[in-house]
């Protein structure tokens, strides 16, 4: 007698097979798993390092209104002129080390790391000189004199940490391109914990007050760099890619510059666009409300981008590794999966914002006016977060392929020739205020994402020459 459940079991298995086939057609599951497993540690790593200077600002902010304004202004200035630039410079290694690892030119990874550190050292000196004129620059920009003086004091003691941050970013890219990412979570979390304790000790126990916060940040960044550096030197995982210091690294500085400067420009042009929006908001009627709304939106976008950064790093590594191995088809497949994952990621964040916007804005302000204003902006913010997620992944493709120069031109044109003029027109001329500013940003981001997508589709995919990787 036949088993009466056999047909049901067969139908159930057939249904599962159909479902599995549909998912496989929609997205390469194995590639998606690889990228997700890789992205998660990078998300936490980026978040922990991001929180080191932020926690110091929080401690300084507790000392008074002047200290709050000075520390916040200093941190913003340090980010757009220093930390973001250093992060961008390290993007050269995503191309050089990523493709070198794929091509099995393992020794060259250590050489490129040293070249990148030389470049970081030179630019750190130049940026530090700029930082020592912070007060004059702020006064030139018509900032409050007392706040400018306080911010300049903060920058003075933050400057020693910039070099450590630059070196740290280079080592992160060096590890990232070899798919060694899980240990990075521990090496980023420990300095954050140390920074919290050090900041409290210097600000409150040692009696250093305001300057204790930036000193703690500098100390913590050096601890982060030295600890990760020792890990690379001592671990057997890097025995083929780190063979010691070499004078050969100086021969590759020019090559590094051809990629690192456009990569830094890519990052900074986008960072600066958001800062300009906050500045424009301060020029409007009711600047306290408009600035607060735009600042909350910018902070929300930045936090959301932390998630995209992890996926962008995974995309860059997968693309550069495949190109280095001569597998263009594999690189394109990785890109396709990354773009789909970016849409899923954006959808999750957007749903959270649309559903929980009231609770979210409550973390920043209890004002009913601010809450109502943010509610009216939430759909615009959802659009920009979606576009930012897509462009973040496509920018990762550009870094993996070595297309930084073209991507820089795209960012310059879309943000400053399209986005900003529309922001000014809608915000001031059409009197849409904060909405108008964000509409301009969305227009710029849409053009940016579309341009990067067209570049990805139509540009020829080739690896760098064997001599460079």
Curated annotation (Swiss-Prot):
Coiled coil: none
Tagged with keyword Cell inner membrane: no
Main location: membrane
GO MF: antiporter activity; xenobiotic transmembrane transporter activity
NCBIfam families membership: matE (TIGR00797)
Family statement: Belongs to the multi antimicrobial extrusion (MATE) (TC 2.A.66.1) family.
Protein name as it appears in the record: Protein DETOXIFICATION 18
């Amino acid at each position: 007698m036949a088993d009466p459940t056999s047909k049901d079991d067969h139908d159930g298995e057939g249904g599962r097979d159909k479902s599995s086939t549909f998912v496989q057609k929609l997205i390469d599951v194995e590639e998606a798993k690889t990228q997700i497993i890789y992205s998660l540690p990078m998300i936490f790593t980026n978040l922990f390092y991001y929180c080191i200077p932020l926690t110091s600002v929080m401690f300084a902010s507790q000392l008074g209104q002047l200290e709050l304004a000075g520390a916040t202004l200093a941190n913003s200035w340090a980010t757009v002129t220093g930390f973001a630039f250093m992060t961008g410079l390290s993007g050269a290694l995503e191309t050089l080390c990523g493709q070198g690892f794929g091509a099995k030119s393992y020794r060259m990874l250590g050489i490129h790391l040293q070249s990148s550190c030389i470049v970081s050292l030179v630019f750190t000196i130049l940026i530090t000189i700029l930082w020592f004129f912070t007060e004059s620059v702020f006064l030139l920009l018509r900032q409050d004199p007392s706040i400018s003086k306080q911010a300049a004091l903060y920058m003075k003691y933050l400057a020693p940490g910039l070099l450590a941050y630059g070196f740290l970013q280079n080592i992160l890219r060096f590890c990232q391109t070899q798919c060694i990412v899980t240990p990075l979570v521990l090496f980023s979390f420990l300095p954050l914990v140390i920074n919290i304790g050090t900041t409290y000790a210097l600000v409150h126990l040692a009696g250093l007050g305001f300057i204790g916060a930036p000193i703690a940040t500098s100390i913590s960044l050096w601890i982060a760099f030295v600890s990760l550096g020792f890990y690379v030197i001592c671990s057997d995982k890097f025995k083929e890619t780190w063979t010691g210091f070499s004078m050969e690294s100086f021969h590759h500085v020019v090559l590094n510059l051809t990629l690192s400067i456009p990569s830094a420009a890519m990052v900074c042009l986008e960072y600066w666009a958001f800062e300009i929006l906050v500045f424009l908001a301060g020029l409007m009627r009711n600047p306290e409300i408009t600035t607060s709304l735009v600042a909350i939106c910018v902070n929300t976008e930045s936090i959301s981008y932390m998630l995209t950064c992890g996926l962008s790093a995974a995309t860059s590594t997968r693309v550069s590794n495949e190109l280095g191995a001569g597998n263009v088809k594999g690189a394109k497949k990785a890109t396709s999966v990354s773009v789909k994952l970016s849409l899923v990621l954006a959808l999750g964040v957007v749903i959270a914002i649309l559903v929980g916007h009231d609770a979210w804005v409550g973390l920043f302000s209890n004002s009913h006016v601010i809450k109502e204003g943010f509610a009216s902006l939430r759909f615009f913010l959802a659009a920009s977060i979606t576009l930012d997620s897509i462009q973040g992944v496509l920018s990762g493709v550009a870094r993996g392929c070595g297309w930084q120069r073209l991507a820089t031109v795209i960012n310059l044109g879309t943000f400053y020739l399209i986005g900003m003029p529309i922001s000014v027109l809608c915000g001031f001329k059409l009197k849409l205020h904060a909405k108008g500013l964000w509409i301009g940003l969305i227009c710029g981001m849409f053009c940016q994402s579309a341009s990067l997508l067209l570049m990805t589709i139509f540009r020829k995919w080739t690896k760098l020459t064997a001599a460079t990787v």
